[in-house]
């Protein structure tokens, strides 16, 4: 069983954190939540873009948590992030470490009416997606698999929130879809 640590990059509603924790546990992961907030700092913020540099943040998370006994460490924050060469990222991962940026998963980011259930659903998908990357999965061609690549929030909506059979088999976990 994989051990996962969730860290808050910003102050997050407990409903979000508990929903993610429950979703991952239902998929067979052992999940712990670090209750301390891993505050984003100004050095990681690009004032011209009004976004956080995901590459630098990921390195900082890795340095901070590299001695922790987890298979994966996932940081979740109500922020907007970018990576070199990309206008934005929903998330970014390396082996063992991942980040999820929630700002663009909210309907109100696009000037639309708040939809909390859709926001939670999108969050579950993107956290699961980045977790898959931290455990060695690449993008999947199965449009229903959570590991399918998303270039827009509409793409996030189209895919499922679980790993397909092939991706589940690679991780040797039970698929709950």
UniProtKB/Swiss-Prot annotation:
InterPro entries, A to Z: MetalloPept_cat_dom_sf (IPR024079), Pept_M54_archaemetzincn (IPR012962), Pept_M54_archaemetzncn_arc/bac (IPR012091)
Details of cofactor binding: Binds 2 Zn(2+) ions per subunit. One is catalytic, whereas the other seems to have a structural role.
Catalytic center residues: 130 (proton acceptor)
A single MF term (Gene Ontology): zinc ion binding
Source domain of life: Archaea
Ligand binding (Zn(2+) 2): 140, 145, 164, 167
Entry's Gene Ontology BP terms: proteolysis
Assembly description: Monomer.
Name of protein: Archaemetzincin
Annotated organism of origin: Sulfolobus acidocaldarius (strain ATCC 33909 / DSM 639 / JCM 8929 / NBRC 15157 / NCIMB 11770)
Lineage of source species: Archaea, Thermoproteota, Thermoprotei, Sulfolobales, Sulfolobaceae
């Amino acid at each position: 069983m994989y051990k996962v640590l969730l860290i808050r990059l910003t102050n997050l509603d407990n409903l979000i954190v508990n929903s993610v924790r429950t979703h991952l546990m239902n998929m067979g992961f052992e999940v712990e939540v670090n209750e301390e907030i891993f505050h984003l700092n100004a050095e990681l913020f690009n004032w011209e873009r009004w976004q956080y540099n995901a590459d630098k943040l990921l390195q900082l998370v890795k340095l901070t948590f590299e001695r922790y006994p987890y298979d994966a460490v996932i940081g979740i924050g109500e922020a907007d992030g970018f990576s070199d060469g990309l206008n934005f990222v929903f998330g970014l991962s390396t082996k063992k470490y991942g980040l999820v940026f929630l700002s663009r998963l909210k309907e109100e980011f696009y000037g639309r009416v708040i939809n909390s259930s859709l926001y939670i659903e999108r969050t579950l998908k993107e956290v699961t997606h980045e977790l898959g990357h931290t455990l060695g999965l690449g993008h999947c061609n199965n449009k229903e698999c959570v590991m399918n690549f998303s270039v827009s929030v509409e793409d996030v909506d189209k895919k499922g929130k679980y790993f397909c059979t092939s991706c589940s088999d690679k991780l040797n976990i039970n698929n709950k879809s």
